[in-house]
Amino acid sequence: MNNLKIYLSGSVRNVNGDFQSWRTQCHFIQENGYYQNLKFVDPIEFFNYTNKLPQSEKQCLDLFMWQIEQCDVVLVNLDYSNISVGTGQEIEHAFCKNIPIIGFGEKKETWYNWSAERCSVIFKTLDIAIEYLNDSYAQV
């Protein structure tokens, strides 16, 4: 069984730090081997808009789009996608490259409708989405 590379997409700017706890949870899952065949690619490990800044927006855009193309699937936190242009671009890029998009979120009133429409399936929680990825995509 090969590793399933999963790109983590979701709002970074204009949301508080607590909102990023879902990314921390993904790292915890990977580091502790809970799902040994899942590998998370988190773009904010490279540029996080606070202390890790790109030299240009093009540099950031090119890297993130390239990372998406190297992944098997995109996992998107849809909460606050209505204020995140970058999340929308990541989702659209994955869609155009025929990369499956799996969504999750609990605050539907903060979702950008077009982002949600691009998802193959949407779950309420991160845990359920990860279990689905492991049981479905990682077993191929």
Predicted regions and their residues:
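Conserved catalytic or regulatory cores that recognize and/or transform ribose-phosphate-containing ligands
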Residues: 1-140
